[in-house]
Amino acid sequence: MKRIALLVQYDGSNYSGWQRQKNATTVQETLERALFKITHQVVKTFAAGRTDAGVHASGQVVHFNIDCVIPANSYSDILNGLLPSAIRILESVEVKDSWHSCYSAMYRHYRYVINNSKFPNLFINNWSWHRYQKILDEVLMSNASKLMEGEHDFFAFQKSGSQRKNSITKIKNVEIKRVEDLILVDIKATGFLYGMVRLIVGQLVLVGEKKISPEIFTDIWVNQKKNDVKESAPAKGLCFVNAVYEENVFKKINNNDFFPVFLIKGFS
């Protein structure tokens, strides 16, 4: 029995999230069906992050166990020949039995993209939120976000339906910057609550539009005022960038941040 790790990229626009579910097309189901076709075995996959419907991934990490003669590094090419073009396997490697795509991760990285231009852009429409009504103040947004760093209870930023025992998690870093008309919100954390990033971004946009102050934003999550959370950012602007481990298991690729920066003029 071998454990195989996959570095996976997908456009989540037409998928009901990562996790397999009844009467819906998901990334996990699509990947497992492709694995069945090539191995003739029922394969259970595990991911570093369970992305919601419409959310993308530029460097999702997945693993599965298999008893098969196929070389580990061949799965990427074979799977890419079977999978829809919206799902790509960037690399496949064999890992230790003790390594787990989810539990071995030190932290995960999500990025949210806001198009703050007055004009729509079809070339980034499926991967950004076109919020154009007011020019966002990214400095205010950044100032409001910094107090979230560290371990806190983020109950206010958790959608109903979560199966977690508690809403405590540790945010490693929040970075918000403007690149011309685009606002990039990068959040790194040990774990994320259900709908957490989209709820955070929704409230930060209100801060950037000066509809609420940074102090009100902080009061909402510190005092768990869930009913005061008024807006959730659309799924299409959110991307699971990567998961970070003590040791990089992928041999060919040293940095699995594959976010398409070539679309962003002046990005560095």
Swiss-Prot record:
- Enzymatic class: isomerase
Q: Which CDD domains match?
A: PseudoU_synth_EcTruA
List the active site.
D52 (nucleophile)
Q: What is its EC number?
A: 5.4.99.12
Q: Give the catalytic activity.
A: uridine(38/39/40) in tRNA = pseudouridine(38/39/40) in tRNA
List the HAMAP family: TruA
Q: What does this protein do?
A: Formation of pseudouridine at positions 38, 39 and 40 in the anticodon stem and loop of transfer RNAs.
Assembly state and interactors?
Homodimer.
Q: What's this protein's name?
A: tRNA pseudouridine synthase A
Source organism per UniProt: Prochlorococcus marinus (strain MIT 9312)
Q: What is the lineage of its organism?
A: Bacteria, Bacillati, Cyanobacteriota, Cyanophyceae, Synechococcales
The gene is truA
